[in-house]
UniProtKB/Swiss-Prot annotation:
Lineage of the organism: Bacteria, Pseudomonadati, Pseudomonadota, Gammaproteobacteria, Enterobacterales
Site (Transition state stabilizer): R28
PANTHER family: GALACTOKINASE-RELATED (PTHR10457:SF7), MEVALONATE KINASE/GALACTOKINASE (PTHR10457)
Protein localization: Cytoplasm
UniProt binding sites for ATP: G124, A125, G126, L127, S128, S129, S130
Enzyme class: transferase
Pathway: Carbohydrate metabolism; galactose metabolism
Enzyme Commission (EC) number: 2.7.1.6
Name this protein carries in UniProt: Galactokinase
GO BP terms, alphabetized: galactose metabolic process
Active-site positions on this chain: D174 (proton acceptor)
């Protein structure tokens, strides 16, 4: 039974009437462009075929009822006429409540909804299960009540909910790719203008995601430290964001910066340039150049931004040794664990799977999880 069938069946069983709509919003993987989003830079993600699915129907009152199928059918119920506050003992509820609260501030022309939510985006793997949920909930209200909101506004609304209501700092990339993803394409996103350009993926290329299953512990505190270091760098150059600093300008005065801040700035500037070049390499089907850029990106995250861990570096080395120059591999996501992403010819997938299975656990004591994904469509009815 797929997620659509599962949520529709549960909806009818619990609420006693059929759902009118089923909405999906995908998770994502970022091919290149790491920690560039909050510096107003470029990212190159694609939506993946793992998603949050919500079966839903409008109500004729002002109540929102939510069932979380993946959490033993836990229930959340709240009124649109009372202040929406956090639900401290049920964390998933806060993503729903935050989205609805921020939607009210954007466009209050909607009423109550019944919904049943289920998803298969791996959690805690850096594949944006939370953004997928936020965009799915926003799309539910937009579709049921014909709200005049486009994908970018639904994405911004989800980001606001996560930053201000849930209390987790994040850039705009995760929500934007979930809302705007295009089948068989990656999107080159300008995080300043929110402009997105579809970049076709070469035929016969697989997007492989391997979760290191190394438990991320530092991610929150270190993420915020990296943001502060980048802001310090932008202030040094008297620019609103590192997006506005050229590598030439940086190289001329790098020795005057705090050495750690200088390394952080160099990563962001070089990563931005790599990301723009990667989009054109991908468009041309130049997997060899894409592989070089991904390797440079990983080295920069390891040495300049210092967000990889030995387990992730081991995974990257195993994959790289298997594929040579036929494609690329790098850490993806916030860092300190999580996943690596590889772009490889489909016929190399079995060899990569085998090499990782034979070597990763032997070297680290941790068993990986292996996903082969397709670049998928963004949020909408399913």
């Amino acid at each position: 039974m797929n997620l659509k069938e599962k949520t529709r069946a549960l909806f009818a069983e619990i609420f006693g009437y059929p759902a009118t709509h089923t909405i999906q919003a995908p998770g994502r993987v970022n091919l290149i462009g790491e920690h560039t989003d909050y510096n107003d830079g470029f990212v190159l993600p694609c939506a993946i075929d793992y998603q949050t699915v919500i079966s839903c129907a409008p109500r004729d009152d002002r109540t929102v009822r939510v069932i979380a199928a993946d959490y033993d059918n836990q229930v959340d119920e709240f009124s649109l006429d009372a202040p929406i506050v956090t639900y401290d003992s049920q964390q998933w509820s806060n993503y729903v409540r935050g989205v609805v609260k921020h939607l009210q501030q954007r466009n209050n022309a909607f009423g109550g909804v019944d919904m049943v939510i289920s998803g298969n985006v791996p959690q805690g793997a850096g594949l944006s299960s939370s953004a997928s949920l936020e965009v799915a909930v926003g799309t539910v209200f937009q579709q049921l009540y014909h709200l005049p909101l486009d994908g970018a506004q639904i994405a911004l609304n989800g980001q606001e909910a996560e930053n201000q209501f849930v209390g987790c700092n994040c850039g705009i990339m995760d929500q934007l790719i979930s809302a705007l993803g295009k089948k068989d394409h990656a999107l080159l996103i300008d995080c300043r203008t929110l402009g997105a350009k579809a970049v076709s993926m070469p035929k016969g290329v697989a997007v492989v995601i391997i979760n290191s299953n190394f438990k991320r512990t530092l991610v929150g505190s270190e993420y915020n430290t990296r943001r502060e270091q980048c802001e310090t760098g932008a202030r040094f150059f008297q620019q609103p964001a590192l997006r506005d600093v050229s590598l030439e300008a940086f190289n001329a005065v790098a020795s005057e910066l705090d050495p750690v801040v200088a390394k952080r700035v160099r990563h962001v500037l070089s990563e931005n340039a790599r990301t723009v070049e990667a989009a054109s390499a991908l468009e041309k089907g130049d997997l060899q150049r894409m592989g070089q850029l991904m390797a440079e990106s990983h080295a920069s995250m390891r040495d300049d931004f210092e967000i990889t861990v030995p387990q992730i570096d081991t995974l990257v080395d195993i994959v790289k040794a298997t594929i040579g120059d036929q494609g690329g591999v790098r850490m993806t996501g916030g860092g300190f664990g999580g996943c690596v992403v590889a772009l490889i010819p489909e016929d190399l997938v079995p060899a990569v799977r085998q090499a990782v299975a034979q070597q990763y656990e032997a070297k680290t004591g941790i068993k990986e999880t292996f996903y082969v994904c397709k670049p998928s469509q963004g949020a909408g009815q399913c």
